[in-house]
Every structure is written in structure tokens, then in C-alpha cells.
């Protein structure tokens, strides 16, 4: 689903779509094997990936670009948190290098896309 307009719904925002994929990837590895039994790490990383998604949705309903960008920055921080936590999963051999690379890169892509959207909002008066 590639939608170029974002006025109608948070689901239209490409950054949210990427964060959703990040969350899907995180859950796919976190709910299996030894990773699933490491409740602390599993809960932290699934919450962080979900937060990347949910903050975009929450900010979308804000009343101003400034408020929206605040939540978008929270989303970016959550992406960075996933990147840090996925190192722990790799170091504990819960995941393969290939899985690490996919999740790390998805978090980086999401972070960058959300950053571009922040710049757009800061330079566009009332885009909605």
C-alpha cells in the first residue's frame, strides 16, 4: 500500500507503514526459541518497535505540526532503541546475522523516512 497523501489517515504515512513492517519483523524473531523466553528483552524490543508505529498514529491526531513532530521524534527514538536492543539479541545468539541486518536496516530506514517527514512538516504550513 503506497499512498502519497497523508491527510486521511495515519496509515497513509509511509513512515508508519515502515514502522509496521519493523514491528512485524521484530515479533517474528522475538516470539520464538530462546528469545521468547528472555522476557525482559522480548518485552523491551516489542514495545520499542510498537512505539515507533504508535507514536506516529498518536501524533497524527495532534492539533499542530509542532505537536506532530514531537511524536515523530519519539518514533525515531524508538527506532534507535530497537537498533540497540537487536544487538543484544544477536550477541545472545537468539537471531542470525541476516535477521539482525534486516531488522537493523528496517529501523534505520524507518528512522530516516520519519526524519524526512519531520523536515517536510517543519517547512510546510498546515499541510493537512
Q: Model-flagged regions — what are they?
A:
Residues 1-128:
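Short, C-terminally biased terminal segments at protein or domain edges
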Amino acid at each position: 500500500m503506497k499512498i502519497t497523501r497523508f491527510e486521511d489517515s495515519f496509515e497513509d504515512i509511509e513512515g508508519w507503514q515502515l514502522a509496521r513492517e519493523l514491528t512485524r519483523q521484530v515479533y517474528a524473531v522475538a516470539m520464538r526459541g530462546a528469545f521468547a523466553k528472555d522476557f525482559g528483552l522480548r518485552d523491551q524490543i516489542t514495545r520499542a518497535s510498537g512505539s515507533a508505529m504508535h507514536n506516529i498514529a498518536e501524533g497524527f491526531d495532534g492539533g499542530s505540526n509542532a505537536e506532530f513532530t514531537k511524536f515523530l521524534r519519539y518514533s525515531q527514538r524508538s527506532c534507535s532503541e530497537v537498533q540497540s536492543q537487536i544487538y543484544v539479541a544477536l550477541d545472545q545468539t537468539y537471531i542470525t546475522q541476516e535477521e539482525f541486518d534486516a531488522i537493523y536496516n528496517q529501523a534505520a530506514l524507518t528512522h530516516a523516512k520519519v526524519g524526512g517527514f519531520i523536515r517536510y512538516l517543519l517547512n510546510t504550513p498546515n499541510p493537512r
